[in-house]
Amino acid sequence: MSDLLAGAYLAKGTIGNVGTPGAPIATFSLVVVPSQHSVTGTVIITQAVQGPDSHIVVPVTGKIYAAGLGKFTQLVSLKGQYVHSVPPPAIGSFLAEFNAHFAIDNAWNGVGGFSYYQHNVENVPVAAAKNLQTELA
């Protein structure tokens, strides 16, 4: 049973153009189990522009696989759902989809993209959290 979690570790970072005014940023905190090719955690999407999509919390699951793509050594895919509330004058909420994909190196830096209700962000940087970079070095 303990072999199921062999090599498990925590990965934290961002997807998006951090520092660009108004750009949506997806911050991830994931438990990665390479032996099972599984990823589970939380993504928080933030945007400086106020509105219904300015702070979204999404529980996610996904897959991680080894890659042979030059400097990128791993491919990650994430998916999840969150409750999206419709702004007035409409009334109601529904489950919206979140998807992300990225190609990263062993330090969790690379390139990727993500999509959520009526938003699609592609070809943006993926960056490991600063404290994670020293732990993985």
Regions found by a protein language model. Give the residues of each.
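Short, cysteine-centered beta-strand-loop-beta hairpins and adjacent loop/turn segments enriched
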Residues: V18-G22, Q47-S54, S85-P89
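N-terminal glycine/threonine-rich, aromatic-flanked beta-hairpin/loop signature
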Residues: V32-V57
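Amphipathic hydrophobic-ligand
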Residues: G22-A26, D53-T61, G92-A96
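Mid-chain, well-packed structural core segment of small domains
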Residues: T61-H101
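Edge beta-strand at a domain terminus
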Residues: D53-Y65, N109-A137
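A short, structured loop/turn motif at beta-sheet edges
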Residues: V31-S38, Y65-F72, I104-N106
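Short, solvent-exposed loop/hinge segments that bridge or flank secondary-structure elements
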Residues: S2-Q36, S54
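Short, solvent-exposed aromatic-acidic interface loops
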Residues: V43-V49, K79-S85, S115-V121
